[in-house]
A protein has these predicted regions:
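Contiguous transmembrane helix-bundle modules in multi-pass membrane proteins
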Residues: 337, 341, 359, 365-483
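Soluble catalytic regions of membrane-associated enzymes that act on cell-envelope
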Residues: 455-691, 695, 702, 712, ...
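Membrane-embedded helix bundles of polyisoprenyl
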Residues: 130-144, 150-234, 245-267, 403-404
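Membrane-interfacial loop-to-transmembrane alpha-helix junctions, especially the N-terminal start
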Residues: 26-29, 147-154, 190-201, 249, ...
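Start-transfer (signal-anchor) and selected internal transmembrane alpha helices
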Residues: 1-46, 248, 437
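Membrane-interface coil-to-helix junctions
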Residues: 37-137, 157-179, 286-293, 347-351
Length: 795
């Protein structure tokens, strides 16, 4: 028997020393962090470990629908492609959405699961980033300073389950790539310091920026500061070597960003063409104690502040760092100064803008707080790697106790904090004291390893549970139900009625998510994205569609005429969280080409108004600028009829409404044809619209109840004294026989006591009247959104 065969037959003994070898530290840290997060979600009963949905905020409204759409693209069941999305907004570009929301490499796991389980791979995106980021941080800490592999793995778990992850990052899978980008770029910067692997480092930077450029920019800035501190402290290197390393890092970062330029430039151009976000206002620096309270694990404050905690092991070592005498004073000062400067930069507006791409973000203004958590982990590792003495550890423990006492009563300090700080903190302190006194004893090291591992694992799990539970109690963080039985039934129904490309099947009515067309299929008007084109949003609004967030979330058109214009042959209607009804209608051609048609060509009355000098686009009495007129212009034919109104009675009727109260009645037919422009307060007839043959075939829509259309009264005269109506053509026309303003009792502003509109005999003549189109002379905008008014604006 040869020597090789004898070696092959020898049994392999797996020992503690083998398992704690440096090569096993990164996967050990990844498994520990992922296990702690899963345990926390199990305690909460959150999906996929319970029935509680985790689709909160944008996770349910954007990321789950976008991942479902990616599944459709991967399996060839979508009506569009990577360049264009025919499902949302009646057709919008998609490439920028893909490069922003779906470039996380873990997002492609969605193709391995059935469509109805698409929420599971979205959870795996978060879980995978936690594991990979923790493993890479373990490697990066080893490059900062040599030391025990399993100890730095435990500290890396604090980074992977830090407050930013469980509070902010878990709800935005695209941000979770920042957890991976920071140690990736840190490793590349370390190679620059040692003048190695420029090409590999460039690729790491490119991967970080391609995955998510927003958080990668934060990580790049943070690691540039870390590299600057390391170069400043590397006094053993000649100055020319340090300058060369700095130049090497700059060229590496620039080249890596250029590699990701196709993704960055596409999203930048799409952002410029999109609806602007609502202006966010930074409300100033939070109280200092509220910021410091965020260092204590287990709580989530109601005061907006950076989420910072990294677990009790990391916090205790950060507190002990200034007292570790084995570390030179200048090193302690440099690292503490860096952390303090970064913390201050988060609450000072100029530097806050620098961290967030020169714009105050909507929502949390502290999205870069994972950067400070990483710096705290680095400081804790430097303290632990220099083997702090018992007295130094005790000083750190006193500092933590003082911090907890000062922050008592702050919103970020909850019941979980008082479980973790004294309970987990005592175990961690005892383990570190034993390690400091009996480091040479193997049995002591095994006991300390087990105690610290359990403390870190259970503490991280409990912190994730408590913070997520506290966050979900906030009203606008309430979980949504995305892919339940009702949603799957709606998807099957849409697939059965699909008639694309002959006509559209509108999934409406925004029942399950803000991106129902992506979630359920079909071709609707709902679309919620940072890249919603400005022209698309305005066009849909001018046709009567509603929007949220100042146009960053559009809704499907609900009027039959608007649906006909968009070629919708099947649609779903129903109240929120109520039964969903399916409607059908004959659809106009999906695409129609016809010569341009002027607004004055639609009816004789508008031509006459234009001849008299009245702006037919803005005057509501003519209707040229109303939703109804725009629909007629697109159809190229008359659809609505404005009834003739005449005054009856003296306007002194009761308050019960009707002609007696308002002094109005309808002359001519007793019902309105269509649901055209009419005065408020008139009876609302059923809608019956017949579209003429040119340019579409005849379309008969069923009688449907039609809500009050948006047809606002003109504003009163800006002079404020003459009780006249502003005509929009350079003056006001007071009513004949109008008395002084004080003589009015129950009349509406701008009307006579009889409730009539002003006459047309005399002008006010006041020089203070602003010209048409000015802020004071402009009539109120037409409201839309289900015809009854704009939906509430979200944040």
């Amino acid at each position: 028997m040869t020597q090789v065969s004898r070696e092959a037959r020898r049994p392999v003994n797996v020992t503690i020393k083998t398992l704690t070898a440096p090569r096993f530290a990164p996967p050990f840290a990844a498994l520990l962090a992922m296990g702690a997060y899963c345990l926390g979600m199990t305690m909460l009963g959150s999906y996929p470990f319970g029935t509680r949905s985790r689709a909160v905020n944008d996770l349910g409204n954007q990321f789950v629908p976008f991942h479902v759409h990616l599944w459709d693209l991967m399996h060839g069941t979508s009506t569009g492609d990577l360049a264009f999305n025919w499902n949302s907004g009646y057709g919008v570009p998609f490439l920028a959405d893909f490069l922003t929301y779906l470039m996380n490499p873990f997002s492609w796991l969605v193709g391995l699961f059935p469509r109805e389980l698409a929420e599971l791979p979205v959870f795996l995106v978060t879980l995978g980033c936690i594991g990979l980021g923790t493993a890479l941080m373990t490697v990066f800490l080893g490059r900062l300073h040599p030391g025990s592999a399993w100890l730095r793995a435990l500290l890396a778990v604090g980074y992977g389950t830090c407050a930013w992850v469980v509070s902010d990052g878990a709800a935005d899978p695209m941000w979770m790539w920042g957890l991976v980008s920071l140690p990736l770029i840190g490793i590349a910067a370390d190679w620059c310091l040692h003048r190695r692997r420029w090409v590999a480092g460039t690729l790491l930077v490119g991967v970080a920026w391609a995955g998510n450029f927003y958080t990668a920019a934060m990580a790049t800035l943070a690691m540039a500061l870390v590299l600057a501190v390391r170069l400043l402290l590397a006094t053993d290197l000649p100055v020319r070597h340090r300058l060369r390393a700095l130049a090497r890092a700059a060229t590496m970062a620039l080249t890596g960003v250029l590699l990701a330029a196709p993704a960055v430039t596409v999203t930048l151009r799409a952002s410029k063409a999109s609806r602007p976000a609502p202006e966010a206002v930074y409300r100033g620096r939070p109280p200092t104690l509220d910021v410091l309270a965020e260092l204590l694990p287990g709580g989530r404050g109601s005061v907006p502040a950076p989420h910072l905690f990294i677990g009790m092991l990391g916090l205790l070592l950060v507190a002990a760092f200034p007292f570790v005498r084995a570390i030179p004073v200048r090193v302690r000062v440099a690292w503490y100064a860096l952390a303090a400067c970064v913390a201050v930069s988060f609450v000072w507006k100029p530097t806050l803008l620098l961290w967030h791409g020169l714009a105050v973000p909507n929502g949390s203004p502290y999205r870069a707080s994972f950067v400070l958590s990483a710096l705290l982990v680095i400081i804790s590792w430097l303290a632990l790697a220099h083997r702090p003495r018992p007295r130094e550890l005790a000083a750190g423990a006193v500092l933590v106790a003082l911090l907890a006492a000062l922050c008592h009563g702050r919103s970020a300090v909850g019941p979980a904090t008082w479980v973790l700080v004294p309970g987990c903190g005592a175990v961690v302190l005892a383990a570190l004291l034993v390690l400091a006194r009996h480091r040479a004893r193997r049995a002591a090291r095994i006991v300390v390893a087990a105690a610290l591992t359990c403390a870190v694992f259970l503490g991280s799990a409990y912190a994730a549970f408590s913070v997520t539970a506290a966050r979900d109690k906030i009203e606008w963080w309430g979980p949504k139900i995305t892919l339940n039985e009702r949603a799957l039934a709606a998807h099957r129904g849409i697939q059965q009625r699909a008639d694309w490309p002959r006509s559209r099947t509108d999934p409406g009515p925004h029942e399950f998510a803000n991106n129902d067309p992506l979630l359920l299929g079909g071709e609707g008007g709902a679309y919620y994205s940072s890249y919603l084109p400005e022209q698309t949003a305005r066009t849909l609004r001018e046709l009567g569609g509603g929007w949220y967030i100042q146009g960053r979330h559009t809704r499907s058109l609900e009027a039959p005429v608007s649906r006909a214009i968009m070629g919708v042959s099947s649609f779903q209607t129903g109240p929120q969280a109520g039964p969903v009804d399916v409607g059908r209608a004959a659809a106009a051609p999906l695409l129609t080409v016809r010569p341009g048609l002027k607004a004055d060509d639609l009816d004789q009355r508008r031509r006459g108004a234009a001849a008299r000098g009245i702006d037919v686009r803005d005057d509501p009495r003519v209707g040229g600028g109303t939703v109804f007129a725009r629909q007629e212009r697109l159809l190229g034919a008359r659809v609505y009829e404005v009834p003739t109104l005449r005054l009856t009675g003296d306007g002194g009727g009761g308050s019960g409404g009707g002609p007696a109260a308002g002094g109005h009645s309808v002359s001519g037919p007793g019902a309105l044809r269509g649901a055209g422009p009419r005065r408020r307060g008139l009876p609302c007839p059923a809608l019956s619209v017949a579209l003429p043959v040119p340019p579409f075939p005849v379309l008969s829509l069923p009688d449907l109840p039609f809500p009050d259309p948006p047809f606002p009264d003109p504003p009163p005269c800006p002079c404020g004294r003459c009780r006249a109506w502003w005509t929009g053509s350079g003056g006001c026309r007071p009513p004949a026989g109008a008395g002084p303003p004080s003589s009015r009792s129950s009349a509406r502003p701008g009307r006579t006591s009889s409730g009539t509109r002003p006459g047309t005999t005399a002008r006010c003549g006041r020089s203070a009247i602003p010209p048409p189109g000015s802020a004071a002379g402009r009539r109120p905008p037409i409201r839309s959104g289900g015809w009854a008014g704009s939906p509430p604006t979200g944040g």
